[in-house]
């Protein structure tokens, strides 16, 4: 209306010729209509066509967000594109609807053992399909092409076998911190990571999907108010492993400028492999393809229906990325040790009880219920073999973690701490130490015991695997609602501010927040709780045990075995 008043001050509308009067009012009405349409049903350009989003008011804020859901960043990976690198999406005519979530990638939802979690969850209404290479964008409603806001690209977790973009709502993060949030999907399980170990199927299809999504962001995010030169990738668990893998991959160079790894790095055991033989043999047997060679097997697998592929996927419960010579030229440990990675600022962190409750509940072991020292020795021998350690190392594990305790409950708790250290904590500290000499690393341990979980889990579990997620990103797990206390709301705002500051400047600190020092030789890190405080030398004794004591013992065992062989 200000524009109307300005026009009237120049020339009264009634003094204009009739036809011109009509044109002016028509333009004003059109202007108002376009403005309204842009707010409620925004339309943005991409390099393949236009997309229409929707306006969302974010609770507890004065801000609104425009959401654009299910934008294709690659062709559907079906037919000849099954087990193939993603290809650019086809252009479309007209305006594409971006107001509903895309189908999740093929996965074994029933394999999650959700009934063990004692949490009431409603099944996701999201459908499932191989045609799943889509991303969603959450951008502050005031943005325009020149807004140049920092971009945060979220990569979901789920062991490379489960997960979907629609579980994570970026609206809160976008509204509170004035950033553009992108959530992406990638192929999972067999369809995402199966490899023949040769040129017929190199594998890492899911990682290549993520690269394609990051390339799409570089091409298009400016139309959604984002700055392609200020992209931070962040993820949790397998999402953190993905982020860490992009840091060492030559294919991802230049596609991002900061990295956040929550409870997952590329050195996590069993999620990066030098070989694919075990899974190759299993899939070949399950498929009924009777392959003469890998080329024939891949040809046969591409002919299988979606239902047949899902049936195979449901039996092969775990799968890893592979050293394929392309996305991962060498094992991440070698790439990190030889400083063959992108020196970008990073936040790396873990939770205080990574193996505290949810992972053991998803993979229940009846032998742990009535454990004693004798049965624990047998469990540790078996565990050592699974860790690819000599069985003789089980005595060292017993001494380091169990001490002389006889109590069954304490033995269980200590076993879970050992597993959390082996799988999550030690790899995270190792990656942080490799990277800190070449770019700033900010390390954290999330320690808060969430009030809404205290009646569900054992009291000794403080911050379990995934517990930081509701505090960092608007998070909805299959319609499970989280109710924060007032203190927890403040903690969430602090964590969101740290993460967004990092996305904006490569440094999480700002006025009003407890200072978070970079990890240096003083080994300082941030303990994230209701009142964040700086800690020093996180798990230093355990780190020494896993990286010095155990390897030394293994070398001694190997030496004695070699001497015995010579005799």
From Swiss-Prot:
GO terms for cellular component: endoplasmic reticulum; intracellular membrane-bounded organelle. Its EC number is 3.1.1.88, 3.1.1.-. Keywords: Disulfide bond, Endoplasmic reticulum, Hydrolase, Microsome, Pyrrolidone carboxylic acid, Signal. CDD domains: Esterase_lipase. One of its GO terms (molecular function) is carboxylesterase activity. PANTHER family: CARBOXYLESTERASE. This is Pyrethroid hydrolase Ces2e. It comes from Rattus norvegicus (Rat).
């Amino acid at each position: 209306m200000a524009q109307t008043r300005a026009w009237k001050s120049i020339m009264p509308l009634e003094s204009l010729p009739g036809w011109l009067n009509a044109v002016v009012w028509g333009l004003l009405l059109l202007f108002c209509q376009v403005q309204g349409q842009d707010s409620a049903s925004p339309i943005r350009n991409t390099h393949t066509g236009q997309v229409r989003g929707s306006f969302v008011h974010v609770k507890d804020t004065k801000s609104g967000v425009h959401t654009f859901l299910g934008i294709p960043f690659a062709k559907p990976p079906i037919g000849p594109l099954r087990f193939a690198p993603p290809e650019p999406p086809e252009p479309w005519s007209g305006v594409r609807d971006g107001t509903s979530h895309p189908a999740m990638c093929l996965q074994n939802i029933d394999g999650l053992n959700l009934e063990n979690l004692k949490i009431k969850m409603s099944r996701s209404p999201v459908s499932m399909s191989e045609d799943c290479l889509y991303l969603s964008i959450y951008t502050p409603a005031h943005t325009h092409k020149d807004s140049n806001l920092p971009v945060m690209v979220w990569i979901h977790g789920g062991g490379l076998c489960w997960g979907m973009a629609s579980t994570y709502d970026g609206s809160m993060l976008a509204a509170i911190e004035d950033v553009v949030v992108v959530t992406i999907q990638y192929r999972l399980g067999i369809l995402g990571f199966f490899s023949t170990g040769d040129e017929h199927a190199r594998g890492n299809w899911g990682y290549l999907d993520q690269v394609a999504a990051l390339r799409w962001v570089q091409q298009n995010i400016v139309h959604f108010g984002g700055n392609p030169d200020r992209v931070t990738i962040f993820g949790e668990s397998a999402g953190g492993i993905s982020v860490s893998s992009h840091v060492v991959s030559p294919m991802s160079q230049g596609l991002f400028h900061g990295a956040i790894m929550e409870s997952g790095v590329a050195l996590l055991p069993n999620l990066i492999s030098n070989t694919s033989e075990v899974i190759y043999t299993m899939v070949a047997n399950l498929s009924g393809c009777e392959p003469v060679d890998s080329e024939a097997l891949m040809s046969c697998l591409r002919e299988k229906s979606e239902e047949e592929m899902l049936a195979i996927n449901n039996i092969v419960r775990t799968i890893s990325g592979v050293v394929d010579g392309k996305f991962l030229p060498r094992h991440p440990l070698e790439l990190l040790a030889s400083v063959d990675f992108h020196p970008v600022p990073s936040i790396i962190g873990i939770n205080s009880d990574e193996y505290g409750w949810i992972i053991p509940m998803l993979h229940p072991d009846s032998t742990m219920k009535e454990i004693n020292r004798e049965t624990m020795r047998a469990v540790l021998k078996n565990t050592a073999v699974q860790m690819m350690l000599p069985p003789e190392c089980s005595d060292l594990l017993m001494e380091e973690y169990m001490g002389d305790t006889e109590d069954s409950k304490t033995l269980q708790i200590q076993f879970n701490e050992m597993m959390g250290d082996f799988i999550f904590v030690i790899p995270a500290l190792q990656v942080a130490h490799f990277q800190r000499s070449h770019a700033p690393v900010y390390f954290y341990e999330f320690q808060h015991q969430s009030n809404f979980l205290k009646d569900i889990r054992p009291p000794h579990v403080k911050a379990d695997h995934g517990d930081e997620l509701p505090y960092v990103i608007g998070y909805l797990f299959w319609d499970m609602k989280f109710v924060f206390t007032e203190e927890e709301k403040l903690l969430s705002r602090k964590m969101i501010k740290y993460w967004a500051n990092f996305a904006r400047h490569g440094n999480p600190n700002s006025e009003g927040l407890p200072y978070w020092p970079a990890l240096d030789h003083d080994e300082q890190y941030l303990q994230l709780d209701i009142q964040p405080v700086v800690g020093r030398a996180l798990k230093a004794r355990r780190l020494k045990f896993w990286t010095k004591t155990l390897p030394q013992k293994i070398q001694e065992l190997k030496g004695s075995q070699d001497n015995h062989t010579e005799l």
